[in-house]
Every structure is written in C-alpha cells, then in structure tokens.
Amino acid sequence: MSEPIVLGIESTCDETAAAVVQGRTLISNVVASSMDEHARYGGVIPEIASRAHAEAFVPCVSKALADANMTLSDVDAIAVSAGPGLAGCLAVGVSGAKSLAWAANKPIYGINHVIGHIAVTQLQFGPFPKDTLALIVSGGHTSLLHVEDVARHIDVVGTTLDDAAGECFDKVARLLGFPYPGGPHIDRHAQLGNPHAIKVPQGLTQGKAGQQHPYDFSFSGVKTAVARWIEQQQAEGNEIPIDDVCASLADSVATVLARKAMRGCEQYGSKTLIVGGGFSANSQLRAKLLEVGAKHGVEVRIPQIKLCTDNGAMVAMLGVNLVESGVKPSEPDFAIDSAMPLTKISM
C-alpha cells in the first residue's frame, strides 16, 4: 500500500486548522486563530470562536489543499477532531468535514483531538517504540498515557484531579495582570527570575496523597498558594517580584510533571516519552524534561513549537495511523463528543 494521504481538520477551540499529511511527511499546514478576538474578554468565548470557525473553514481547507498542490480527489481520507472540545466549535469542523467527505466520496475519521497531540510527534521523530509513554499538557488536560498502539489502544496512567497545568498558569497570569493568553507571558518572565525565590507546593508528590496518586496531577493548590502569597505581599505594601513569581511557579509545575513522567517510564519500562499539547511549548518544561530524561536514560520527544499548539497536522497524522492500521472509518452520521474520553481514539 502506498503512503496514505489524509486531510486533517481541527476546530476544537480557538484555532481553525487544516493540513495534508502523506505517510510521515507534512505537505501543508494552515492555521487561522481567533485568539485576538477573545483577548479582550480574558478567555475564549465559545460563540465568538464558533463564528470564527465558520468564517475560516473554507479558506483554511482551500489553502491547505492549494499549498499541497492537490484537490479533494487526491486525498485518501479526511480526519477531523470530534472531541474533546467546545461543542459549538466541534460542530462547525465536523459538519464541514462531513460535507467534504460526502461530496468527494471519501472515508472520514472523527478522531480524538488529544491523541492527535501524541501522533503528531511522528512527523518529527518517526514511529513509536514499544511501551511508549505520553505526557499531554494543555489548558484543559494534564495526563500521562501508555501508548500500546496509537491507532487502537491507549491506557490512562494518570490524569489531573482538578486544574490542568495550563489552566493553573492562566489563572495566575490573571492575578499578575497579564493579558490573555497568560502562559507565554509567564514563560518570558520566568526566564528572568529566581525559581527558588518563592516556595511553591508540588501537589501529589509527597506523603499519603503522593502514594495514593503516584501518576495523577493536582495544580489547584499551586494556584491558591501563589494567589495567597501575592495577596499577602500586596497587603504589606510590597512590590510583587513578577519575574521571581513566574520562575518559581514554572519550576514547581515543570518539576512535578517531569518527576511523575519519569516515574511512569520506570513503572512501564519505557525508554521513550512523548510530550504534546499547547503547554509543552513552555520553555521551562521543555528544559526540565530533557534534563531529567537524560539522567534517567529516557528519550524525550517534544515536537517543534508550531506542532505543540492545536493544528491540522496532528489530526491528519492520527488519521494516517488509522488508515494504515485498517481501522474502520467513522459512520457518516457520527456525533461530536465534547467530553470524549482519552481511551477512545476515534468515533
């Protein structure tokens, strides 16, 4: 069988994206973001995001095909994010993808957006070794997964019990007065600060809680501790050392993620850790994981920044895996699932 060509379409949140992947080669990748429209509200407004998807869908898909010098007739299948995500946003992408699949008589795969973050690393690093672990870190998810077969079988090793890592950063960013999205601002300030200036807790790493939840994550306590420290400093009339706050927060979160990921690798005998999701663009986390991975003899695969955030390439790459593995395409009338479980790879 020749290398399958898949058109991937993404619309789970505030990015409308389309890409064409052939085998393990990225042919085209187009992203249109509505982030600027949400910035003044301090977060994503679902109705605005849905309308932006409707406006950007056709231009994105058209450009992705044009950049690949292809038409719909050239692709072997269409893959689209069916969940998890914002229901209205998912509906736009899925309905558009279904229309294309029907018009061109192509098979369609409604895929799990989060698992796409795992699959996309194949574009940069190639196939997954046996017993690969994946750390997914984003605004909505912080999970450790065992990848037995990215097209057929994934197990959840650990997940967040409250706030995800990206969510924690966004909330602290608001306290510091940073505009949305706050994560990149914390990242930049953290590079200038002292990571040991402020004592920030490391949730679920010690005592009974750490033993009961060795691979789970909790960042609500981190957010609360930093918030209280800031409030105390303000009450005492002290100037907030923003760089140090950001550095201490980033170091605490990165340390927890790296420690639990390495513990998982040891448990499963994995020598490869895949990292994905928008938060994996954080420079402190990338450095910490590479450092700890080298000490433990674990190859850490973190994709380039443009493949960390939401994109169509990740959707198309997972679609390629599904086609190659002979997974049955989704039914034409499959539904979106805004709370799609991580163990469900496709509809």
UniProtKB/Swiss-Prot annotation:
Disulfide bonds: none
Species in which this protein is naturally found: Bifidobacterium adolescentis (strain ATCC 15703 / DSM 20083 / NCTC 11814 / E194a)
Gene Ontology terms, MF aspect: iron ion binding; N(6)-L-threonylcarbamoyladenine synthase activity
UniProt keyword annotations, A-Z: Acyltransferase, Cytoplasm, Iron, Metal-binding, Transferase, tRNA processing
NCBIfam families: gcp_kae1, T6A_TsaD_YgjD
Residues holding Fe cation: H113, H117, D310
Compartments in which it is found: Cytoplasm
Binding-site list for substrate: I136, V137, S138, G139, G140, D170, G183, D187, N282
Cofactor: Fe(2+)
GO cellular component term, pick one: cytoplasm
Origin organism lineage: Bacteria, Bacillati, Actinomycetota, Actinomycetes, Bifidobacteriales
Gene Ontology biological process terms, A to Z: tRNA threonylcarbamoyladenosine modification
Classification via SUPFAM superfamilies: Actin-like ATPase domain
Protein name: tRNA N6-adenosine threonylcarbamoyltransferase
